[in-house]
């Protein structure tokens, strides 16, 4: 209809068309459109006796502003819902007449997306940076710069101030901007990074995320290491968000595991939190998790739980990994606080959950991915852990482009 109106206006060389309300009937017009009747009367039009000139509002031409799953537009931090939004639920030709229920659903998603930035984990503090982060970044830089960057030294013999742009090449969730900046700062404290995004933001293909200014030699030497961190962390955050969104209508807490890249755990677990997941254990001192080999070493589930309580009485909770129904029964009898159901069939999961009957918290684990999490998310458990959040997430494609000298070249 909007297209037909637009074509008619083009044909008539006018900025309006005529709408005839008379076939509706006076009583119905007065009942349903009292404000239109009053407004037209003020302008000298009698809707009961003549057609009136009209033009569709801009969003009717557009079919609404295009939004994503969370009602987010292409403009940073701008959301659109209802008649202003084109969400694609009913196809690309759907105009702005979104239903109330549809609007409520997308409003809820928008609200949840807005609050994520306030729930995002804090960045690394100065102490953490100095003691835990900087040594890892410096080690990574030494992999690339053992003595000199021969390529850069070949074309840049002297210092020259320059600028390069951080460009997003695919849609995703950005994470690790502080580490990206820190990588350059460890090479040269005078490097300046101006960000146009924050950790946890949705970013889109072609979007400018940052401008980095400094000695061009430093920018060239540090770009690969800085991008490696940022791409890896953003990839994990993006995949975690995908999985977390599948659990949005549940109370389940999504957990990561210790299946991380050696020497990169601090970065990868931070990225999981940015994506909406939670950290399980950061390291072996964070809690008791009795797995199959611990149980084998102890002799039984019962002995393992008792030995753990005797050795670490201050530990708040003891978790036990089980693989069979007999192990489930033994873990419950032993007083395990959390029971991890590992690599179980759907039938065995249901049987085990029914048997536990809230006598312990329940975690499901074992090859859980975005593709199969729907199989277990409605079983009434407390946690779902997924090693895939860190070991199977692909990088987010990002690039440093358009390096150029500032104020000419010496």
Predicted features along the sequence, with ranges:
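FAD/FMN-dependent oxidoreductases across multiple families
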Residues: 35-78
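Glycine-rich beta-strand-to-loop/alpha-helix junction loops that act as flexible
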Residues: 81, 341-342, 362-368, 386-388
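Hydrophobic alpha-helical scaffolding
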Residues: 19-30, 52, 64, 93, ...
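An anion/pyrophosphate-binding glycine-rich loop and adjacent beta-alpha core
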Residues: 1-50
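Short, glycine-/Ser/Thr-/acidic-enriched flexible segments
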Residues: 24-26, 59-60, 66, 72, ...
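Short, charged, intrinsically disordered terminal tails
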Residues: 388-410
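Acidic/glycine-rich phosphate/pyrophosphate-binding loops and surrounding catalytic core
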Residues: 123-321, 326-334, 338, 347, ...
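Glycine- and aromatic-enriched mobile tails/lids
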Residues: 4-10, 60, 66-80, 84-128, ...
């Amino acid at each position: 209809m909007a297209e037909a109106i637009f074509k008619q206006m083009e044909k008539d060389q006018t900025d309006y068309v005529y709408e005839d309300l008379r076939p509706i009937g006076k009583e119905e017009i007065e009942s349903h459109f009292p404000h239109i009747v009053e407004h037209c009367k003020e302008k000298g039009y009698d809707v009961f006796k003549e057609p009136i000139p009209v033009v569709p509002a801009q969003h009717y031409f557009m079919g609404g502003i295009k939004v994503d799953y969370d009602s987010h537009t292409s403009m940073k931090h701008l959301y659109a819902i209802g008649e202003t939004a084109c969400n694609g639920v009913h196809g690309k030709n759907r105009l702005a007449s979104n239903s109330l229920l549809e609007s409520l659903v997308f409003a809820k998603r928008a609200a949840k997306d807005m609050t994520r930035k306030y729930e995002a984990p804090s960045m690394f503090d100065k102490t953490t940076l100095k003691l835990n982060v900087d040594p890892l970044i410096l080690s990574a830089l030494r992999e690339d710069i053992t003595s000199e960057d021969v390529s850069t030294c070949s074309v840049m013999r002297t210092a020259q101030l320059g600028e390069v742009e951080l460009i997003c090449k695919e849609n995703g969730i950005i994470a690790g901007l502080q580490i990206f900046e820190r990588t350059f700062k460890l090479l040269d404290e005078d490097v300046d990074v101006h960000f146009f995004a924050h950790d946890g933001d949705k970013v889109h293909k072609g979007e400018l995320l940052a401008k980095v200014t400094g000695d061009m030699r430093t920018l060239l030497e540090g770009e690969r290491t800085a991008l490696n961190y940022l791409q890896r962390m953003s990839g994990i955050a993006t995949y975690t968000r995908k999985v977390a969104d599948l659990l949005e209508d549940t109370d389940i807490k999504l957990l990561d595991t210790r299946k991380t890249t050696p020497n990169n755990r601090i970065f990868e677990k931070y990225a999981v939190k940015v994506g909406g997941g939670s950290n399980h254990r950061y390291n072996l001192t964070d809690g008791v998790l009795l797995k199959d080999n611990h149980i084998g070493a102890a002799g039984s589930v019962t002995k393992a739980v008792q030995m753990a309580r005797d050795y670490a009485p201050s530990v708040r909770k003891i978790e036990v990994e089980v693989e069979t129904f007999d192990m489930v029964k033994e873990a419950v009898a032993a007083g395990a606080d959390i029971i991890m159901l590992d690599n179980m069939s759907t039938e065995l999961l249901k049987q085990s959950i029914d048997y536990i009957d809230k006598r312990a918290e329940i975690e499901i684990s074992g090859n859980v991915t975005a593709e199969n999490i729907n199989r277990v998310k409605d079983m009434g458990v407390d946690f779902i852990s997924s090693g895939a959040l860190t070991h199977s997430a692909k990088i987010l494609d990002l690039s440093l482009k358009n390096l150029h000298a500032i104020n000419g070249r010496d």
